[in-house]
Regions:
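Short, conserved "active-site rim" segments that organize catalytic pockets and cofactor/ligand binding
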Residues: 1-71
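Short HxH-centered metal-ligating active-site micro-motif
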Residues: 56-112
């Protein structure tokens, strides 16, 4: 429970800092979502799309899964792509992998 409290405290402090830097940040963020990019990336906690791209929340629509896979049977991923293209009108789709991906290593290791 202590770690959960710490997360909420960190979130509150982050929100206060953002609000101090830009008092209308959350208002602007809530009013629209018009990203130019759909990022399909790995769930690995070391590769967050916004930070890798240097973009703010709202600038990139993100779908993450283990090993950044796009498979025709993954309806979650397909619905994200459809929503991004048809509703958000993204201009670019980025499928981004990374070195030493545990998901890719696991998938390539099984010969079944």
């Amino acid at each position: 429970m202590k770690l959960l409290k710490q997360l909420f405290t960190q979130n509150r402090l982050w929100a206060e800092q953002i609000k101090a830097e830009d008092p209308k940040f959350f208002e602007k963020l809530a009013s629209q979502q018009a990203p130019e990019y759909l990022w399909i990336g790995c769930s690995d906690s070391r590769v967050p799309a916004n930070e890798l791209l240097g973009l703010l929340p709202g600038d990139v629509f993100v779908h993450r899964n283990v090993a950044n896979l796009v498979v025709h049977t993954d309806f979650n991923c397909l619905s994200v792509i459809q929503y991004a293209v048809e509703v958000l009108k993204v201009k670019h789709i980025i499928v981004c992998g990374h070195y030493h991906c545990g998901g890719v290593i696991a998938a390539m290791g099984h010969k079944e």
